[in-house]
Amino acid sequence: WDYASNVSSERLTRLANSGAEHLYVCPGVQGWNQLINKYHEAYENISRMARYGHECHAMGLLNTDWGDYGHINHPDFSRIGMIYGAAFSWNADILPEEEINRQISVLEFGDASGKLVSVLDLLCHQDAYPWRTAVMVQEALELHQDKEEAAELLRSCAEGDADAANASI
């Protein structure tokens, strides 16, 4: 398994070349700690892992959907990533991202414009206060009783610097 959007084939190739049998690739739908899944990252991860699986003659693809801290995203938001996995695991000719997103928008969601998945992908990157940060602040307040740590996290988020807030965790 590897959930990075820029995952390389190195580890899977080493396993395949070592004679390991029963290889599976396990990408993810990119919904953990997210209200709306990260669809571009899911496309990159799932398409790469599926391609590597085809190249290394993997027995299958296990597309994962899991969550941290309560799995806050609605299961319907994972459908797009699940469709990526279904399409790519059975067909080595992987569609370009824009085309499969258009097809999913039309076929799965009945969106005649073909733009719904692209809009959802924009929305998933608009969180001003990431769920992971909210959980860490809560833990700092309740578990560690570290009010200064929680205050620093809140300041970083209030200043719009979610990356700094997450880095301080």
Segments (PLM) and residue ranges:
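Substrate-binding groove of N-acetylhexosamine-processing glycoside hydrolases
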Residues: 1-169
